[in-house]
Every structure is written in structure tokens, then in C-alpha cells.
Design a protein with these regions (language model features):
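Helix-to-loop junctions at the C-terminal end of transmembrane segments
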Residues: 51-63, 150
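Hydrophobic core of transmembrane alpha-helices in multi-pass small-molecule transporters
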Residues: 91-106
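Cytoplasmic membrane-interface "Motif A"-like loop-to-helix N-cap segments
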Residues: 60-72
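A late C-terminal transmembrane helix in Major Facilitator Superfamily
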Residues: 116-151
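Symmetry-related core transmembrane helices of the 12-TM Major Facilitator Superfamily/SLC fold
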Residues: 158-174
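C-terminal ends and interior cores of transmembrane alpha-helices
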Residues: 74-87
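Extracytoplasmic gate region of multi-pass secondary transporters
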Residues: 1-52
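Intracellular juxtamembrane helix-capping segments at the cytosolic ends
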Residues: 105-119
Length: 193
């Protein structure tokens, strides 16, 4: 489960840091007013804060299954940002970026907690540290990948930026199944979670 969790962290941080780093620039390049592009970046952060707070109870109860669902929901939302940016309606763009933040940062909050809970208490801080540390590779790769793809039409670029979330959904569902099987085989571990 541990290497899969490293991958889940890296994929989510890759997608999030791409969105955070490139959204204002790409929206300005798509001929939106700089103020609207900046608001799109802010909506991403505000959505993330709201998502982290609003979803914490659901994430705590359903852990990896909830995270997998949120990853899957993030795919069309993130993919739609490029199309929303090309419309003449800033409200559509701000809504898309708000919900992208809601889901993507909500996922990050969820994997921070659920990822730690797969380890026994004696290993929890070590396991969490490795997950966050190796996940940071994604936070470096995301903006760099954006720099390589920046010549694409903005709608295509956001479709590609949704790929890490699609992969994250599948991998997180696998983690859910593996963790459920592990807990069924060792019921004493369920109490530690």
C-alpha cells in the first residue's frame, strides 16, 4: 500500500501545483482580463479551503473510497477550466476553479489523514513523512510539465492536467480495496484506525 500512497500524493500534488502555478497565466494568455485571471487563482484557493473544511467528516468516515470519488469528480471539473476560460462569462470560470480547488485540496486533506491511518501508531509519523516527502516530487513535476505543454490550446492543456486526477482515482480505489482486505484479515488493526 505504501508505494501506491506515494503515487497518490505525487499525482494530487502534481495536478494541484500545475493548477496553482499556471491558471492565472493561462487565463491571461486566453485573453481574459488580468483581474479575472487572478480571481480564478484565488477561487482555486478559496475552494480548497472550503472543500477541506466541508468534507472532513465525510472523508474521515469513508477514507479511501471518498478520496477516490473526489479524484474522479475532479477530472471533469479540472478539464472544464480551459473551456470555461474561453467563454465570455467570468462567473463560469470562477465556478470551475472554485470547485476544482474544493475537490483537489479536499483530496489532499483526505489523503493526509487517511494516508497516516494505514500505519500503526508507532510508524505513523515516519509513514506520513515519507508520503508527503515523496509526494512533493509531484509538486515539482506539475509546474514543469505545464511549462512544456504551455504552447497547447488552453482547453487541451486543462484536459491533460486532469489525467493525474484520473490516475489518482484508480490508484486510490485500489488502495481502498487493499486496505479493506487487510483490515478484514486483521480486525485488530481496525481499532487503531
Amino acid at each position: 500500500i505504501t508505494p501506491l500512497m506515494w503515487l497518490v500524493f505525487a499525482l494530487n500534488l502534481m495536478g494541484f501545483f500545475f493548477l496553482l502555478s499556471w491558471t492565472p497565466t493561462l487565463m491571461t494568455a486566453a485573453k481574459l482580463p488580468p483581474a479575472t485571471a487572478a480571481l480564478a487563482g484565488a477561487a482555486l484557493q478559496v475552494g480548497g479551503t472550503v472543500g477541506s473544511l466541508a468534507l472532513c467528516g465525510w472523508l474521515q468516515r469513508n477514507r479511501f473510497l471518498a478520496i477516490s470519488i473526489m479524484f474522479a469528480l475532479a477530472v471533469p471539473v479540472v478539464g472544464s477550466i480551459g473551456f470555461a476560460g474561453l467563454t465570455a462569462q467570468p462567473a463560469l470560470l470562477l465556478t470551475a476553479t472554485f470547485f476544482a480547488g474544493f475537490l483537489v485540496l479536499g483530496v489532499q486533506s483526505g489523503i493526509n489523514v487517511a494516508g497516516a491511518m494505514i500505519y500503526p501508531t508507532s510508524l505513523r509519523s515516519n509513514g506520513s513523512g515519507w508520503q508527503l516527502g515523496l509526494g512533493r516530487i509531484g509538486s515539482i513535476v506539475g509546474p514543469l510539465a505545464g511549462a512544456q505543454l504551455v504552447g497547447m490550446p488552453v482547453q487541451n492543456l486543462y484536459m491533460w492536467s486532469a489525467v493525474p486526477f484520473a490516475l489518482g482515482a484508480v490508484i486510490c480505489f485500489i488502495v481502498h480495496r487493499l486496505n479493506t482486505a487487510r483490515l478484514d484479515a486483521h480486525p485488530e488493526l481496525r481499532e487503531a484506525q
